[in-house]
């Protein structure tokens, strides 16, 4: 068993070895709120993902912050509907919001090359 960072570096290297573009995404935030804002885990998983991306020269999409900002704009009551079973796993509607965020950022990272694969 290895660390989160070890596995992320391994995935980046394996991706590149196959000629693909490595993109690391931080985890999306859980449905945890304080003072009207969703909690960001900027000092653990999101930070570690960003550090590996920087160390390996991979693209990084900070879903923790990007999705949290969207959740904040929607509000706690609306976002609660995305998490019917627990505060970690979204339903399809929540997954679609996350997916739209990833697609939006892929279009910005390397215009043209990866965007052609997105609908």
Could you describe each region identified by the protein language model?
Residues 1-96, 100-118:
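Alpha-helical cap/lid subdomain in secreted, periplasmic
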């Amino acid at each position: 068993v290895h660390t989160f960072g070890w596995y992320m570096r391994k995935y980046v290297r394996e991706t590149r070895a196959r000629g693909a573009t490595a993109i690391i995404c931080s985890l999306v935030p859980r449905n945890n709120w304080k003072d009207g804002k969703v909690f960001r885990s900027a000092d653990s998983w999101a930070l570690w993902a960003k550090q590996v991306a920087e160390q390996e020269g991979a693209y990084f999409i900070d879903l923790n912050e990007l999705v949290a900002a969207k959740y904040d704009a929607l509000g706690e009551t609306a976002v609660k509907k995305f998490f019917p079973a627990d505060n970690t796993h979204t339903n399809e509607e929540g997954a679609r919001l996350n997916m739209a965020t990833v697609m939006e950022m892929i279009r910005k990272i390397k215009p043209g090359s990866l965007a052609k694969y997105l609908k």
